[in-house]
Amino acid sequence: MAQSTLYSRVLGTGSYLPPDRVTNQQLTDRLAKEGIETSDEWIVARTGIHARHFAAPDVTTSDLALEASRRAIEAAGIDPQSIDLIIVATSTPDFVFPSTACLLQNKLGIKNGGAAFDVQAVCSGFAYAMATADSFIRSGQHRTALVIGAETFSRILDFKDRTTCVLFGDGAGAVILSASEEPGVLGSALHADGSYSHILCTPGNVNRGVIEGSAFLYMDGQAVFKLAVNVLEKVAIEALAKANLAPEQIDWLIPHQANIRIMTSTCRKLGLPQERMVVTVDQHGNTSAASIPLAFDTAVRDGRIQRGQHVLIEGVGGGFTWGASVFRY
């Protein structure tokens, strides 16, 4: 008897934003006290961002991940003890080690000895994490995965650099992936090119208890924009080809919420109407690895994304990394 094909399928989604919502005007006022000039109009025109959320000083990345995970677990209707794989995509972990995923496993009270680890691919981290979880499930090694993107990017922002500090926010998003004979994740593609590591980075490192180099995010905005618009279309087409789907068969595009200009450019190149693109960057800012699952959960909970629809996620981030996945929700 032929063995049936095993897929990974999304059972539930969840997200969490810290309560401190900071509008452009509030941020502008804060920067003005430091002699840094910007404006709501300047930020909106260049990024599409109107507000972002910042975590309180005593709140960690694993705390945000915990809230998003609880909501995803509730939506999936599963026992947390059935989760045998946890992958957290983050560039702002609680510690150098142990991993945020291990900390999260403990906070969730999961005691089954399942695997838990972090993925660090910056803004494309969730695409990397989801593809990794899908591979583990398809191989039969794990059955139920909790995949999270969570960030506290406010901790690595230089609030004297108006070109970067206005862009980012904190938050977390999560999905439950489970083994299924029903098609779920249909195709993924992941890439990296380390020769571009210098255009988007946080170059500092810890050496004998001292931070050497800068602990703040650095970005060459023009170089990032040029590379992003080039690779995102290509990786999306690659993932679609693996899924045996044409762009017009995609019901929803969920891009990494970095910049509205990059997002609309990719949507246009794929020939998709703007109405099929989920946009949350205006209210969340760029939450790095959290942006895709945050946007996904938002669109699921407001009723836009329905069961049976095809969803394309794609992202690009420091490294340089980029990736995409296509799945049927």
Swiss-Prot record:
**Stored InterPro entries:** ACP_syn_III_C (IPR013747), ACP_syn_III_N (IPR013751), FabH (IPR004655), Thiolase-like (IPR016039)
Q: In which pathway does it act?
A: Lipid metabolism; fatty acid biosynthesis
Q: Provide the protein's localization.
A: Cytoplasm
Give positions of region: ACP-binding: 257-261
Q: Does the keyword Cytoplasm apply?
A: yes
Reaction(s) catalysed (UniProt annotation)? malonyl-[ACP] + acetyl-CoA + H(+) = 3-oxobutanoyl-[ACP] + CO2 + CoA
Query: Which Gene Ontology CC terms are recorded?
Result: cytoplasm
Q: Report which superkingdom the organism of origin falls in.
A: Bacteria
Enzyme Commission code: 2.3.1.180
**Active-site residues per Swiss-Prot or TrEMBL entry:** C123, H256, N286
Which one GO biological process term can you cite for this protein?
fatty acid biosynthetic process
Short name of one Pfam family: ACP_syn_III
Q: Which GO terms describe its molecular function?
A: 3-oxoacyl-[acyl-carrier-protein] synthase activity; beta-ketoacyl-acyl-carrier-protein synthase III activity
The protein's UniProt keywords, in alphabetical order, are: Acyltransferase, Cytoplasm, Fatty acid biosynthesis, Fatty acid metabolism, Lipid biosynthesis, Lipid metabolism, Multifunctional enzyme, Transferase
Q: What is its main location?
A: cytoplasm
Family per similarity comment: Belongs to the thiolase-like superfamily. FabH family.
- Entry's free-text remark on domains: The last Arg residue of the ACP-binding site is essential for the weak association between ACP/AcpP and FabH.
Assembly mode: Homodimer.
User: What functional role does this protein have?
Assistant: Catalyzes the condensation reaction of fatty acid synthesis by the addition to an acyl acceptor of two carbons from malonyl-ACP. Catalyzes the first condensation reaction which initiates fatty acid synthesis and may therefore play a role in governing the total rate of fatty acid production. Possesses both acetoacetyl-ACP synthase and acetyl transacylase activities. Its substrate specificity determines the biosynthesis of branched-chain and/or straight-chain of fatty acids.
Its recorded name reads Beta-ketoacyl-[acyl-carrier-protein] synthase III
- Species, as recorded: Burkholderia lata (strain ATCC 17760 / DSM 23089 / LMG 22485 / NCIMB 9086 / R18194 / 383)
